[in-house]
Amino acid sequence: MRLTAKQVTWLKVCLHLAGLLPFLWLVWAINHGGLGADPVKDIQHFTGRTALKFLLATLLITPLARYAKQPLLIRTRRLLGLWCFAWATLHLTSYALLELGVNNLALLGKELITRPYLTLGIISWVILLALAFTSTQAMQRKLGKHWQQLHNFVYLVVILAPIHYLWSVKIISPQPLIYAGLAVLLLALRYKKLLSLFNRLRKQVHNKLSL
C-alpha cells in the first residue's frame, strides 16, 4: 500500500520531532550533568553525529522510495537535508564558541586551514549551506539544470563528513567506522549515477585542458 499525502504530512511531523528531540536532550544533559568528563567534546561529537545521521537519512530516501515503490517519500528528503544543515551548524558553532571561545574567534580561520580534519568539515558545511539555501522550489526553477549539478555535491559531503569524523576522534573505534560503512553502502547504491558523474567531469576537464 502506497503512502498518501496525509500520511507523508504526519511522517514529516515525526521527522521534525526526530530533529528537535536530540536538541532538547542535549539542553537537559548540559543542565543536569548528563555529559561525560569532557562536556565540550561530548557536545561537539553529539552534534556532529546527529548531523551525520540526518545526512545518511537524506541519502537513504531516494533508494528507499524506489525499492519500496513509495514515490511520495521523496517529499521528506528536503526536510531531512535541512535538519542535517541545522545540526551541522550547531556542530560548527559548538567548536567555535566552546572549543575556541568567544575571545578567540579570530583564530577560527587559521584553525580551519591548518587542521586538515577541520578543513574537511568546513568544506562540508559550506556545501550544505549552499544546498540549504537553494533547496526551495523557487531556487530550483531559477537555477534550472544547474540546480541538480549543484545538489550533486551532496555526494562529496557524504565522502568528506565520515572522514572528518574518523580523523577527529584520532583513534579507531566502532562508531565512526559504522557511519563510514553506511556512507559507502549508500554511495554504492548509486554507483551508476556516480560513475556517470565522474565520466562527465573527466570529459569536461579533458576538454578544458585540450583548449
From Swiss-Prot:
The chain crosses the membrane at residues 10-30, 82-102, 116-136, 153-173, 178-198. It is found in: Cell inner membrane. It holds the Pfam family Ferric_reduct. It is a multi-pass membrane protein. This is Protein-methionine-sulfoxide reductase heme-binding subunit MsrQ. Its cofactor is FMN; heme b. Binds 1 FMN per subunit. Keywords: Cell inner membrane, Cell membrane, Electron transport, Flavoprotein, FMN, Heme, Iron, Membrane, Metal-binding, Transmembrane, Transmembrane helix, Transport. InterPro entries: Fe3_Rdtase_TM_dom (IPR013130), MsrQ-like (IPR022837). It comes from Escherichia coli O17:K52:H18 (strain UMN026 / ExPEC). Part of the MsrPQ system that repairs oxidized periplasmic proteins containing methionine sulfoxide residues (Met-O), using respiratory chain electrons. Thus protects these proteins from oxidative-stress damage caused by reactive species of oxygen and chlorine generated by the host defense mechanisms. MsrPQ is essential for the maintenance of envelope integrity under bleach stress, rescuing a wide series of structurally unrelated periplasmic proteins from methionine oxidation, including the primary periplasmic chaperone SurA and the lipoprotein Pal. One of its GO terms (biological process) is protein repair. The keyword tRNA processing does not apply. GO terms for cellular component: plasma membrane. Belongs to the MsrQ family. Heterodimer of a catalytic subunit (MsrP) and a heme-binding subunit (MsrQ). NCBIfam families: PRK05419.1-1 (NF003830), PRK05419.1-2 (NF003831), PRK05419.1-4 (NF003832). The keyword NADP does not apply. GO terms for molecular function: electron transfer activity; FMN binding; heme binding; metal ion binding; oxidoreductase activity, acting on diphenols and related substances as donors.
